């Protein structure tokens, strides 16, 4: 796989027309490894209609789909590649966020790594984060991760199955430590979901978004 960005700016699927979405809270969907912007977009109709949903395609080709940053077989990554991917999304967000009163991030798997990275780089920019069957990046002491500014007030939903066969234990351990220190956490464990999303979880996400974003 090449490190070259396939698209100069993200390809985005919107749930509403440009006229309809202006002034509505923005919910940005970030798909997982090897998927595309269609993957999570089917969930848009199951979430509160008050949101304008934008499902963003990752910039790097991976098989028939796309990825935010390269992975090795052990799900390892380069922090610099993660930061480059987050720049790609932040540059796009900077061009659209002025049309919305708030921005919330929803990421699945690698998309959760992206969502939490975006929050850590811009701690004041996001109303909430939803992480589904994913992890937060261990950025070490890299200055671009502004964890010291995250004081536990930003709401975050983290749903996962303890039997998830994809996300490795070291990544769960790091993520557990990070969320406990830096966000207002709603954590839910599911059974029989494996590395996926189920109807019960989407119901919980719906409640979380309504309570933590729309009712604020």
Model-based region annotation:
Residues 124-137:
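A conserved short beta-strand
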Residues 157-160, 164:
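Short beta-strand/loop motif that positions the catalytic acidic residue
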Residues 65-77, 134-155:
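Flexible "cap/lid" loop of the alpha/beta hydrolase fold
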Residues 3-100:
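Serine-hydrolase catalytic machinery in alpha/beta-hydrolase-like enzymes
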Residues 105-107, 132:
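Short beta-strand immediately N-terminal to the catalytic nucleophile in serine-hydrolase-like folds
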Residues 42-43, 168-178:
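Short alpha-helix in the alpha/beta-hydrolase fold that links the catalytic acid
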Residues 107-111, 115:
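Gly/Ala-rich beta-loop-alpha elbow adjacent to hydrolase catalytic centers
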Residues 173-216:
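C-terminal catalytic histidine-bearing segment of alpha/beta-hydrolase fold enzymes
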């Amino acid at each position: 796989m090449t490190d070259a960005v396939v698209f100069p700016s993200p390809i985005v699927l919107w749930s509403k027309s440009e006229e309809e979405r202006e002034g509505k809270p923005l919910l940005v969907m970030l798909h997982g490894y090897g998927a595309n912007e269609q993957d999570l977009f089917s969930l848009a109709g199951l979430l509160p209609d008050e949101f304008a949903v934008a499902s963003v395609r990752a910039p790097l080709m991976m098989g028939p789909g796309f990825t935010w940053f390269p992975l090795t077989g052990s799900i390892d990554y380069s922090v610099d590649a993660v930061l480059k991917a987050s720049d790609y999304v932040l540059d796009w967000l900077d061009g659209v966020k002025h049309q919305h009163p708030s921005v919330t991030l929803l990421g699945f798997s690698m998309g959760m790594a992206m969502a939490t990275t975006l929050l850590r780089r811009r701690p004041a920019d996001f109303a909430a984060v939803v992480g589904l069957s994913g992890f937060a990046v261990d950025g070490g002491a890299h200055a671009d991760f502004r964890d010291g500014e995250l004081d536990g007030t930003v709401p975050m939903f983290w749903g996962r199955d303890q039997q998830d066969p994809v996300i490795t234990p070291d990544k769960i351990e790091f993520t557990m430590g990070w969320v406990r220190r830096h966000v207002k956490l709603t954590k839910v464990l599911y059974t029989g979901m494996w590395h996926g999303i189920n109807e019960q979880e989407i119901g919980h996400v719906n409640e979380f978004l309504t309570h933590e974003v729309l009712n604020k």
